[in-house]
C-alpha cells in the first residue's frame, strides 16, 4: 500500500513524509532506539492502571507505540494529537481497537492549552526534545493541569547524559547511529534533523521542570547509554 502513496505523482510533502516514515519503521523494527524495551515498560504501566482509563497522546505520530501498548486493555478513550496529517492517516488506518479513538491535527503545545478535558493518562514519546527549554517547562505545567486527580504523565524522551552538552549528546547519538542498519543517505537525513531540530535536556533539567509542575516521577526505562529515559509522573 505504501508504495502507491509514495508514488512519484504524490504531493512532495506526502512523499517526503512516507520516506521518513519508512525510515522510522526500519529503526523500530531493528530496535535501534530500544522501542522493544520502551514498549514493554509502557505495557507494564498501562496494565497497572485501573480500567477504564482515558489516554491523550501528544505528538502521537502514527500512534503505533500507543496502539500496541494498549492492545486488549480496557481503555475508555484515546486521543492522538500531531501536526503531521499523513501520520494521523496512517494511525487511523492501523487502528483496530474496540475503544473510542480520535486523532486531532494540531500543535501539541497549543492543544494542551485549549482542550477542556482531563485525562487519566497523558503520554508523549520522543516529542518534548524538539521544544525550546522555556516551552518545555510551560508545557509540563499545562499537562499537569489536565491530569485527573489520580492521573499520570508517561514521558519518554531523549536526554543529555550527566555533564554532557546538547552538542556532545547529539554527537554521541550520531556515533551510535553510525552502526545502525540503514543507508548512508538515511544516516545523513537523521544527522541533519538532529542538528537542526533536537534539543535534549539533562535529567536534572527534566526533573526540576517536573517538580515545578507539581509532579513527582518514577523511572520506568533508561537507555543503556543514558541517552533516553522513561518516567511515570504523578502529583
For the regions a language model picked out, list residue spans one by one.
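Conserved class I S-adenosyl-L-methionine
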Residues: 2-50
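Class I SAM-dependent methyltransferase SAM/SAH-binding core
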Residues: 56, 63-110
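Core SAM-dependent methyltransferase catalytic element
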Residues: 216-235
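Short catalytic micro-motifs in class I SAM-dependent methyltransferases
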Residues: 126-127
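C-terminal alpha-helical "lid/dimerization" subdomain adjacent to the S-adenosyl-L-methionine
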Residues: 156-212
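A conserved beta-strand element that flanks and buttresses the S-adenosyl-L-methionine
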Residues: 123
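Short conserved loop adjoining the S-adenosyl-L-methionine
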Residues: 110-116
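A short glycine-rich, Lys/Arg-flanked "PGG" loop and its adjoining helix->strand segment in the class I
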Residues: 137-149
Amino acid at each position: 500500500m505504501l508504495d502507491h502513496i509514495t508514488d512519484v505523482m504524490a504531493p512532495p510533502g506526502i512523499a517526503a513524509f512516507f520516506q521518513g516514515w519508512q525510515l522510522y519503521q526500519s529503526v523500530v523494527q531493528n530496535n535501534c532506539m530500544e522501542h522493544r524495551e520502551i514498549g514493554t515498560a509502557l505495557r507494564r504501566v498501562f496494565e497497572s492502571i485501573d480500567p477504564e482509563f482515558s489516554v491523550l497522546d501528544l505528538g502521537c505520530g502514527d500512534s503505533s507505540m500507543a496502539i500496541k501498548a494498549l492492545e486488549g486493555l480496557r481503555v475508555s478513550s484515546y486521543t492522538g494529537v500531531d501536526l503531521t496529517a499523513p501520520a494521523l492517516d496512517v494511525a487511523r488506518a492501523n487502528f483496530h481497537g474496540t475503544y473510542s479513538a480520535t486523532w486531532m491535527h494540531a500543535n501539541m503545545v497549543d492543544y494542551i492549552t485549549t482542550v477542556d478535558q482531563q485525562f487519566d493518562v497523558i503520554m508523549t514519546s520522543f516529542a518534548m526534545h524538539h521544544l525550546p527549554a522555556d516551552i518545555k517547562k510551560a508545557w509540563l505545567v499545562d499537562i499537569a493541569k489536565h491530569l485527573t486527580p489520580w492521573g499520570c504523565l508517561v514521558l519518554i524522551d531523549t536526554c543529555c547524559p550527566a555533564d554532557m552538552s546538547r552538542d556532545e549528546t547529539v554527537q554521541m547519538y550520531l556515533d551510535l547511529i553510525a552502526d545502525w542498519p540503514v543507508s548512508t543517505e538515511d544516516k545523513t537525513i537523521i544527522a541533519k534533523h538532529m542538528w537542526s531540530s533536537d534539543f535534549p535536556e539533562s535529567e536534572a533539567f527534566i526533573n526540576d521542570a517536573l517538580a515545578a509542575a507539581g509532579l513527582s516521577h518514577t523511572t520506568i526505562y533508561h537507555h543503556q547509554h543514558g541517552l533516553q529515559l522513561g518516567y511515570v509522573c504523578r502529583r
